[in-house]
Amino acid sequence: MRIGHGFDVHAFGGEGPIIIGGVRIPYEKGLLAHSDGDVALHALTDALLGAAALGDIGKLFPDTDPAFKGADSRELLREAWRRIQAKGYTLGNVDVTIIAQAPKMLPHIPQMRVFIAEDLGCHMDDVNVKATTTEKLGFTGRGEGIACEAVALLRKAEK
């Protein structure tokens, strides 16, 4: 078994909505990013790539490449997952923690889990998403941005 950890953060800027876990969430602010700014899927993609020793999202989909301008993070996740599967791995489980003072994530978490399970071709029981605040401390607590951490467990596929 192999474990990977991912982290991502984006500052608020411009107008909303925002996309988190593949879900469009109404909010007065947007997130500044080269792609769609989906911190949850970026952290998850990094965790999966790390577990497979395939680098990180910035290596695979560099923000210096215009091809990824405004990219759909679900597509990036699916492409990373194809590469991981090609290396002979299957999914154990994933756990995603969104860190944001606002907007509230709880109403959107069920759909995030559905999208992630679809993109990874796994059962929803293998996908956990949760959200927390920092009790108004730090940049997320001041409403300056959103952060996310993710962990992933991979297994070598049986032959």
From Swiss-Prot:
Database matches in Pfam families: YgbB
Residues holding a divalent metal cation: D8, H10, H42
Residues engaged in binding 4-CDP-2-C-methyl-D-erythritol 2-phosphate: 8-10, 34-35, 56-58, 61-65, 100-106, 132-135, 139, 142
Q: Which cofactor does it need?
A: a divalent metal cation
| Pathway membership, UniProt | Isoprenoid biosynthesis; isopentenyl diphosphate biosynthesis via DXP pathway; isopentenyl diphosphate from 1-deoxy-D-xylulose 5-phosphate: step 4/6
Supply the EC number(s): 4.6.1.12
Keywords from UniProt, A to Z, are:
Isoprene biosynthesis, Lyase, Metal-binding
What are the cysteine partners in each disulfide bond? none
Catalytic activity, as annotated: 4-CDP-2-C-methyl-D-erythritol 2-phosphate = 2-C-methyl-D-erythritol 2,4-cyclic diphosphate + CMP
Which molecular function term from Gene Ontology is one that the record holds?
Answer: metal ion binding
Recorded family membership = Belongs to the IspF family.
Q: What does this protein do?
A: Involved in the biosynthesis of isopentenyl diphosphate (IPP) and dimethylallyl diphosphate (DMAPP), two major building blocks of isoprenoid compounds. Catalyzes the conversion of 4-diphosphocytidyl-2-C-methyl-D-erythritol 2-phosphate (CDP-ME2P) to 2-C-methyl-D-erythritol 2,4-cyclodiphosphate (ME-CPP) with a corresponding release of cytidine 5-monophosphate (CMP).
Self-association and partners: Homotrimer.
NCBIfam families in UniProt: ispF
Query: What is the protein name stated in its UniProt record?
Result: 2-C-methyl-D-erythritol 2,4-cyclodiphosphate synthase
Organism of derivation:
Klebsiella pneumoniae (strain 342)
Q: What is the lineage of its organism?
A: Bacteria, Pseudomonadati, Pseudomonadota, Gammaproteobacteria, Enterobacterales
